[in-house]
């Protein structure tokens, strides 16, 4: 009887061992893939500004010849509507600075009367972006007609176009480029940067970058960069004389570049037309106590050193 029970135990034990041996072993690769998948799930998704520029739908009179006016306005269409809205308004502001049109009267301009039927398809469209741009296009065409009436052979042109410059990170940037020639001695150009926080969905201004009570320190650093620029560009024998005509001022038009904070200036802001669109660069190593930590470049992690084999002894 005891022998029979012992035999039964041995049989059951042998069966359990056999079944365990038949189970498939876990593939190490599968385990590694699961670990990678877990890490990827835990890593936060970085927000990215994606978009394209699309031309504004304006109507211009038919024109043939080499002196036809060129009017091009493009707008940003992105995955962040709050940015599109801000850029749209800045485009309209830029057009107003270039053309400086007044509010249209009841009759409208000559060009407006010619294209009214095809450009505006009802009163409900008057406040749309394209309808507002059309007003500036009408003023632009009227200017062209006036110049041609004076027997001018000038070909006037106007371009306003945004571009995504920095799509990821703490600060994303859209640049708005504009250029125009309206029949004067020379053309004009401008470059404005608009910076945004995608997480908070807000525009970032220069003062947002600064630590408390550090604006004066930034102005001092920018003024030193200005002095260096004046002398390096050979604009004057000394900075004091130069500032009699072109005094320094701090620009609010900025870009966080790879090497430092870039302050962008427009034509005639800190120099004559010949200097174009000057910019001052303040290196990040000078801004450690001026900019908030989140706006400074993060130090790159040092690669792990390779193990060194030692001989036994």
Regions inferred by a protein language model and the residue ranges of each:
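Compositionally biased intrinsically disordered regions enriched in Thr/Gly
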Residues: 23-313
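Bacterial N-terminal signal peptides that target proteins for export
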Residues: 2-11
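C-terminal motif of bacterial Sec signal peptides marking the signal peptidase cleavage site
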Residues: 18-21
């Amino acid at each position: 009887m005891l022998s029979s029970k012992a035999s039964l135990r041995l049989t059951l034990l042998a069966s359990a061992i056999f079944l365990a041996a038949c189970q498939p072993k876990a593939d190490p690769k599968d385990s590694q893939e699961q670990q990678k998948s877990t890490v990827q799930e835990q890593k936060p998704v970085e927000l990215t500004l994606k978009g394209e520029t699309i031309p504004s739908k304006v109507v211009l009179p038919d024109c043939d010849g080499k002196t036809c006016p060129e009017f091009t306005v493009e707008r940003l269409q992105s995955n962040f509507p709050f940015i599109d809205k801000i850029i749209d308004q800045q485009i309209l502001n830029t057009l107003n600075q270039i053309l400086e049109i007044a509010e249209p009267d009841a009759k409208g301009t000559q060009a407006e009367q010619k294209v009214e039927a095809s450009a505006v398809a009802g009163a409900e469209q008057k406040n749309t972006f394209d309808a507002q741009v059309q007003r500036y296009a009408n003023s632009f065409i009227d200017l062209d007609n006036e110049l041609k009436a004076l027997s001018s052979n000038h070909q006037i042109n106007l371009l306003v176009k945004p571009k995504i410059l920095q799509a990821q990170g703490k600060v994303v940037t859209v640049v708005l480029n504009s250029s125009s020639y309206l029949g004067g001695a020379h053309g004009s150009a401008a470059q404005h940067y608009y910076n945004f926080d995608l997480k908070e969905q807000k525009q970032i201004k220069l003062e947002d970058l600064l630590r408390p009570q550090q604006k004066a320190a930034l102005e001092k650093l920018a003024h030193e960069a200005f002095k260096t620029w004046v002398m390096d560009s050979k604009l004057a024998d000394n900075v004091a004389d130069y500032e009699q005509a072109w005094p320094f001022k701090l620009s609010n038009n900025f870009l966080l570049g790879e090497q430092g904070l870039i302050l962008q200036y427009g034509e005639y802001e800190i120099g004559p037309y010949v200097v174009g669109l000057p910019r001052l660069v303040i290196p990040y190593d000078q801004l450690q106590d001026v900019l908030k930590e989140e706006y400074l470049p993060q130090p790159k992690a040092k690669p792990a050193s390779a193990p060194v084999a030692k001989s036994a002894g």
